[in-house]
Amino acid sequence: VTTSGVQEDVHDRPPMTERRLHPVTPLRRAWAPVAVLMGWAVHDLDGAQRQLTRLTTTTLLIGLGVLIPAAALYGFLSWWFTHFAVTDSELRVRTGLLFRRTAHIRLERIQAIDVTQPLLARVAGVAKLKLDVIGTDKKDELAFLGAGEARALRAELLARAAGFAPETAHEVGEAPSRQMLRVPPGVLAVSLLLTGATWVWLLVAAVALPLLWTATHSLWTVLAAGVPMLGAAGASSVGRFVAEYDWTLGESPDGLRIDHGLLDRAHETVPPGRVQTVRLVEPLLWRRRGWVRVELDVAGSSNSLLLPVAPREIAESVVARVLPGVTVPPPEALVRPPRRAHWCVPVWWRGYGLAVTDAVFAARHGLLRRSLSLVPHAKVQSVRLVQGPWQRARGVADVHVDTGANGTVAARLRPADEAAVLLRAQAERSRTGRRDALPDRWMA
């Protein structure tokens, strides 16, 4: 290729269009200076009170007259100097007032893109994009965009990540979604009331507070101890109810769609092929109703909840969608450790179980809160046999399988000879599974 040919090719490329965030963004960023002052005041409450007592009304008004415009100017300038653009290969974000910073997010490294709307953002009609990128511990985000623009940008980024040409990616639009199920608010509320954490805190309060009153006869002492206990009990139920309200699960070509939230609305996507482990969690008080909770380990993503509560039959059908070709082993198929294992883990050894099928490595643990972990053979990165001195004396061992999401699933307290055979067999199943696995794709 000649130099002139390269120059002509560069000139023929469409110019990169830089865009700004939504105009309400300065209101969000203007809070930064105010937050610094509030943080200082909370950190040194006595010093802040002394400073306030020295201020006259005139001085306070002058200070507010300077602070508010300064904060507004900071918010405006930070918004004005923030741009983003989508190129052929990356999402480019430029920020900074004095020191310019440019973030280059490679499209092929994007694992998932979520659209979230906090309460005030819903009122203003804006949203923010959260991007799960390989190699980062936290999500990158663009905040804020118009709600429609956020969804359009998400669709464009996913289309480009899937390999669509840049000139057609913006025309692809958001992939259609088919609703699979919706968790009724009443079912969610009952399930949260039946979780162990709520009742543990209530039981602690019921026992500790009367004892505290008997010992001190001080109402303030009882309130000081009781309010945090009741607050913890409420937070474990009310907080989760607000976050998991109207949980809706849908299916689309780019993965499973999850919409949820009473105040802060979130729209998340579980990308296909990235699920490393699926867990079916069954608290004690849920068993009579046949409910389970479905959790995930997803490589490159912090999303970990697929279903907050669902009947077991429905949950198993959803698992079959997440892990095609996988059937959840029934409880009777899970083999317990031998009785001699009770010397290693008294009582709780009965909660362990193992089943290995052609598709998954399944391990169970827990008596009061059962958890069944399913790992597809193709997702196993390594296999380890662990045997401590006490286990060696009792002739048992643990077999650990490690996944790509930095997770580990263990088959506890297996007979030593069985564990050695399982170690070799699982390594071979993993190699075969990775060889025969279909490639991970964003879109069909």
Predicted regions and their residues:
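N-terminal basic, Ser/Thr-rich segments that initiate or prime the first beta/alpha elements at protein or domain
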Residues: V1-A444
